[in-house]
Swiss-Prot record:
CDD domains attached to this UniProt entry: M20_peptT
Organism: Limosilactobacillus fermentum (strain NBRC 3956 / LMG 18251) (Lactobacillus fermentum)
Protein name as annotated: Peptidase T
Purpose: Cleaves the N-terminal amino acid of tripeptides.
Major enzyme class: hydrolase
HAMAP family for the chain: Aminopeptidase_M20
Length: 413
């Protein structure tokens, strides 16, 4: 296997990727899947073996917590490093990573025997990785670089610091959490117990990503109660719940969809629609960077439901609308130095920081609103949440480089 400047990094990542930890948005437990619990226990044993202190799984939020003690004789702000262990809502059984060494930057990459390929035409980002080692899927599952790349990078950092005591640093807190992909992982994060002054999630994408702004996010769950009667006698009697759902969807702006928007444009995303004539259920994601536009989107959906119920003559449509997280940038006001530290670390290493409003969210969004400023750093993954996911080993190495540089800068007088 490819030699790495950080021994064990690639091996760790592949080992972690093979463990199924898909979170379950229908579960009411924490973590949502027992497989996450098993993996967290596996990682706890690894951190204990590396000599980290106070290794434990938090009894309420199931975060795996650990401390790298300071080796410097003066006060230094405590840095936190966070990642999540669950993977997204895509097949994660029997993940079989493929290692492509010295990729030429121009060829298509077959994904095992699945018949799928990573093609230059469809994924031009591949051109950036000429001469690098890529880890891909075999075409049947996702890879899980989101966020097991981040997990591997943090644990590799811990191992490297153990082997290099000459690197002076303050106390570092590590937190590896569940259920980020279903939006609940950080809901019960205990900032006081974690004990950091500032933190970073290592959960971003390609080299240089530094995210200090996210969407505001809400979810809308809509249930429609129809009335099913024989089609031969349906006139003025039948209420087709499926058709009501279609009518509702058609009242939303056609261009306010993920596939029609970019940059700071918000959207409504209908990502589940199940139904019969008798009952239908629609689930929407509502997203916008601008708080006022976010609130307006929610009110527009409420108004559509009210109008449809009025037209039906009775309340056949119920709406459960709730916020999921808020724009990270608002919570980071007054803590710009946390972003600047990461930016300077990248610049000192010759990496161009790529700072832009991310079209998504991170656990750092929630954690920042709980009082711990937590921007997001790149972990390396491309095409996440899909069979076309891949990651560059060299980008993962540079993620560790950046963490080491940040630690050094934080320890400077």
């Amino acid at each position: 296997m490819t030699d790495s400047k950080y021994p064990g990094l690639l091996e760790r990542f592949i080992k972690y990727a093979k463990v199924e930890t898909r979170s379950d948005d229908q579960s009411k437990t924490v973590p949502s899947s027992p497989k996450e619990t098993a993996f967290l226990k596996q990682l706890a044993a690894e951190l204990t073996e590396l000599g980290l202190e106070n290794v434990r799984i938090h009894p309420q939020n199931s975060y795996l917590l650990a401390t790298i003690p300071a080796n410097i004789d003066r006060p230094v702000p405590v840095m936190g490093l966070l990642a999540h262990v669950d993977t997204a809502d895509f097949n994660a059984e029997n993940v079989n990573p493929q290692v492509v060494e010295d990729y030429d930057g121009q060829s298509d990459i077959p994904l095992g025997d699945s018949g799928y390929k990573l093609t230059i035409d469809e994924f031009p980002s591949l051109k950036k990785y000429a001469g690098q080692t890529l880890v891909t899927t075999d075409g049947t599952t996702l890879l899980g670089a989101d966020d097991k790349a981040g997990v591997a990078e943090i644990i590799t950092l811990a191992a490297y610091l153990k082997e290099h005591p000459e690197i002076k640093h303050g106390q570092i807190q590590i937190g590896l959490g569940p259920d980020e992909e279903i939006g609940t992982g950080a809901d019960h994060f205990d900032v006081k117990d974690f004990g950091a002054d500032f933190a970073y999630t290592i959960d971003g994408g390609p080299l240089g990503e530094l995210e200090d702004e996210t969407f505001n996010a809400a979810q809308a769950e809509i249930d429609i109660q129809g009335k099913d009667v024989h089609t031969g006698t349906a006139k003025d009697t039948m209420v087709n719940a499926i058709q009501v759902g279609i009518d509702l969807q058609n009242q939303l702006p056609v261009h306010d969809r993920p596939e029609k928007t970019a940059d700071r444009e918000g959207f409504y995303h209908l990502y589940k629609f199940d139904g019969t004539v008798d009952h239908a259920r629609l689930v929407y994601l509502i997203r916008d960077h601008d708080k006022k536009l976010f609130e307006a989107r929610k009110e527009a959906l409420r108004a559509i439901v009210r109008d449809l119920n009025a037209n039906l003559g009775e309340d056949r449509i119920s709406l459960n609308l709730y916020d999921q997280y808020y724009n990270l940038k608002d919570a980071l006001k007054g803590h710009e130095d946390v972003v600047e530290l990461a930016k300077k670390a990248m610049e000192d290493l010759g990496i161009k920081p790529d700072i832009y409003p991310v079209r998504g969210g991170t656990d750092g969004s929630t954690i920042s609103y709980l009082g711990l400023p937590t921007p997001n750093l790149f972990a390396g993954g491309e095409n996440m949440h899909s069979r076309f996911e891949y990651v560059s080993v060299q980008t993962m190495e540079k993620a560790v480089d950046v963490l080491l540089k940040m630690i050094a800068l934080n320890a400077e007088e």
